[in-house]
């Protein structure tokens, strides 16, 4: 069993026997249609997102052996999200949205207002594989984004957000 938390990459199995792919855990690129992303998220979350603010997308892919175990309580998860959002808002003007592919097992994560990834738009844009635990993406209004794939800490979310702020 592999612990991915401190590794810079994942090993992803392919459909070809004995052939795997290495995927970097931090991804960076630029969306050409960033306005379409904001529009889609507004439609599915029923929130108004300020287009001049950055966007943090917290993503839950569904249950796996990493996010269905552990000792976190509902209270500790609430505190975790609250602290993450509080510092994100100090780092940048930012909209934070919580998106899921499969809500099975999500009850223990209920602090946040989770929204289904209808038509798998977010998954196709940022999370092409099921990365263990969950993932996140931070998007600058210019379309420049950074994603953290798989189990993540608040400090990693903050770091990639700070990187984008400094780059712009």
Language-model region placement:
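Non-globular targeting/processing and membrane-anchoring segments
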Residues: 1-88, 92-100, 167
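Short catalytic/ligand-binding loop motif for oxyanion handling, primarily in non-cytosolic enzymes
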Residues: 64-68, 104-108, 146-147, 156
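"Short basic amphipathic alpha-helical interaction patches in structured regions
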Residues: 70-74, 110-113, 151
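Extracytoplasmic/secreted envelope proteins and their assembly/folding machinery
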Residues: 81, 85, 123, 154, ...
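Structured segments of extracytoplasmic/periplasmic soluble domains
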Residues: 87-91, 128-129, 160-163
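Thioredoxin-like thiol-disulfide oxidoreductase module
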Residues: 103-132
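A short, hydrophobic beta-strand/beta-hairpin element that forms part of a small beta-sheet core
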Residues: 133-148
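Non-catalytic, surface beta->alpha helical segment in thiol-disulfide oxidoreductase systems
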Residues: 145-166
């Amino acid at each position: 069993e592999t612990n991915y938390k401190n590794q810079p990459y994942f090993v992803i199995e392919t459909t070809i026997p004995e052939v795997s792919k290495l995927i970097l855990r931090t991804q960076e690129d630029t969306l050409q249609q960033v306005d379409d992303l904001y529009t889609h998220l507004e439609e599915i979350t029923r929130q108004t997102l300020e287009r001049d603010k950055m966007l943090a997308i917290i993503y839950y892919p569904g249950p796996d052996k990493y996010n269905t175990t552990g000792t976190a309580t509902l209270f500790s998860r609430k505190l975790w999200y609250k602290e993450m959002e509080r510092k994100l808002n100090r780092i940048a003007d930012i909209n934070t949205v919580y998106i899921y592919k499969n809500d099975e097992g999500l009850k223990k994560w209920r602090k946040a207002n989770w929204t289904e990834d209808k038509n798998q738009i977010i998954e196709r844009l940022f999370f092409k594989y099921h990365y263990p635990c969950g993932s996140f993406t931070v998007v600058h209004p210019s379309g420049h984004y950074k994603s953290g794939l798989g189990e993540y800490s608040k400090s990693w979310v903050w770091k990639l957000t700070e990187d984008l702020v400094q780059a712009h």
